[in-house]
From Swiss-Prot:
Gene Ontology terms: biological process: cell division; cell wall organization; peptidoglycan biosynthetic process; regulation of cell shape; UDP-N-acetylgalactosamine biosynthetic process
Entry function: Cell wall formation. Adds enolpyruvyl to UDP-N-acetylglucosamine.
Subcellular location: Cytoplasm
Family per record: Belongs to the EPSP synthase family. MurA subfamily.
One GO MF term: UDP-N-acetylglucosamine 1-carboxyvinyltransferase activity
Record's GO cellular component terms: cytoplasm
Protein name: UDP-N-acetylglucosamine 1-carboxyvinyltransferase 1
Domain of life: Bacteria
Residue(s) carrying 2-(S-cysteinyl)pyruvic acid O-phosphothioketal: C141
Catalytic residues of the enzyme: C141
Length: 441
């Protein structure tokens, strides 16, 4: 593959420094209007970046979103001995070139893992490629327990030896991972991806049953197969991987971010505006657009664009999160913000993560009427919200507070916005382009 002009070596001092004192100031009462492009999918890019460690060849990854989680993953790859070059930024992301022919590390410390839970994706590739990894327990958003037992049990089934000591997971394999049958007690997206990456270089065939079906898993399969892997079944609940001895160079474009796309459609709905999201795969957001229609939003789809036209006031609707193709848990906080000003009572049930109603406390500061118990929230819509100072508890919850601030009367200040930087590229610019008044201070 020819090297395009303009590529430069990414500096080791990657731009992922946490700035907890930064905040957003959002002016309420605006109707968003216009078009907005969708970035590459965060939840597809992260496992694909980890999968680049599986080959000594060159991995060219287009449409990688320039967000903090990707920056952290790039720095981890540097730490492990990979070389990463970053090209000019496009509308939806950048091109990254990765060469992992000189891996010289197997440890991922707490300074990285506390930043990002997705660092766990490195276990499968490193075990498959070099046979060893020592990794601190992953961090990320504080949205309740996300046990990594699915990952560990699956890797053990493939032949890995795993010990947990002093806050670290130490895993090794004597010679080569061995193909086997794995049944996941829950269709975990991360575990499915980790086991796929581990199994592509294993000896024999691996079958993953009750696998997650998310589009990001289909994208990972496409990336792996372009490297020379033999994976089939992604998008279904049974995935089969025939191990190969070596993988080669690859060029791949990351799919659009369905959560970002759905979030901008929700922004149109809550503000009574009209927003066209460009560069989306419409079927990836079907569960969200169906719910927005139920709430009174007009949805139009054509090609790779989706338009949402919000009503004067939304109607209440019940939401239950489920594994794909059900309603995504990463859109549940945003839907709570919409329900807070809808006409009627909405019942929101969270079945994926525990403790994902933290945004309810902050929405109540703005005048929302929300009662939570366990995994259920009852949201009685109010005619209007009032601007307030609120604290961002996690990535998607922070976006929910921005949506509420756009709808509220007056000015809303959102603190601890470093969470939001983990998942949205050029957020202020995109919202400003749609007519929002939002500033980072």
């Amino acid at each position: 593959m020819d090297r395009p002009a303009g590529l430069r070596l990414r500096p080791r001092e990657v731009a992922c420094i946490v700035k907890p004192n930064e905040r957003y100031v959002v002016a309420g009462g605006c109707r968003l209007q216009g078009e907005v492009p969708v970035s590459g999918a965060k939840n597809a890019a992260l496992p694909i970046l980890a999968a680049a460690l599986l080959t000594s060849g060159e991995s060219v990854i287009h449409n990688a979103p320039m967000i903090r989680d990707v920056a952290v993953m790039i720095e981890i790859l540097h730490k492990l001995g990979a070389r990463v070059e970053e090209g000019p930024e496009g509308v939806s992301g950048r091109t990254l070139r990765i060469r992992a022919d000189g891996l010289n590390g197997q440890e991922v410390g707490a300074d990285f893992t506390r930043e990002m839970r997705s660092s766990i994706f490195l276990m499968g590739p490193l075990l498959a490629r070099v046979g060893k990894i020592r990794i601190s327990y992953p961090g990320g958003c504080a949205i309740g327990p996300r046990p990594i037992d699915f990952h560990l049990r699956g890797l053990e089934a493939l032949g890995a030896r795993i010990e947990e000591r002093f806050g670290y997971i130490e895993a090794s394999v004597p010679r080569r991972l061995r193909g086997t049958e794995i049944y996941l007690d829950f269709p975990s997206v991360g575990a499915t991806e980790n086991l796929m990456m581990a199994a592509v270089l294993a000896e024999g065939t691996t079958v993953i049953r009750n696998a997650a079906r998310e589009p990001e898993i289909v994208d990972l399969q496409a990336f792996l197969n372009k490297m020379g892997a033999r994976v089939r079944g992604a998008g279904l609940d049974v995935i089969r991987i025939d191990g190969v001895s070596k993988l080669g160079s690859v060029e791949h474009t990351v799919i659009p971010d369905r959560i970002e796309a759905a979030t901008f459609l929700a922004a149109a709905a809550i503000t009574g505006g009209e927003v066209t999201v460009q560069g989306v795969i419409p079927e990836h957001v079907d569960a969200v657009t169906a719910k927005l229609r139920e709430m009174g939003t007009t949805i139009r789809e054509y090609g790779t664009a989706v338009t949402a036209v919000g009503p004067r006031r939304l109607k209440a609707a019940d939401v239950k999160t489920l594994p794909y193709p059900g309603f995504p848990t990463d859109m549940q906080p945003q839907m709570m913000a919409l329900a807070a000003t809808a006409d009627g009572t909405s019942i929101i049930t969270e079945t994926i993560f525990e403790n994902r109603f933290k945004v309810a406390d902050e929405l109540r500061r703005m005048g929302a009427n929300i009662k939570t118990e366990g995994r259920t929230a009852v949201v009685q819509g109010v005619p209007s919200l009032s601007g307030a100072t609120v604290v961002c508890p996690a990535l998607r919850e922070g976006m929910a507070l921005i949506l509420a601030g756009l709808r509220a009367e007056g000015e809303t200040t959102i603190e601890d916005i470093y969470h939001i930087d983990r998942g949205y590229q050029h957020l202020e610019q995109k919202l400003t382009r749609l007519g929002a008044t939002i500033s980072r201070v």
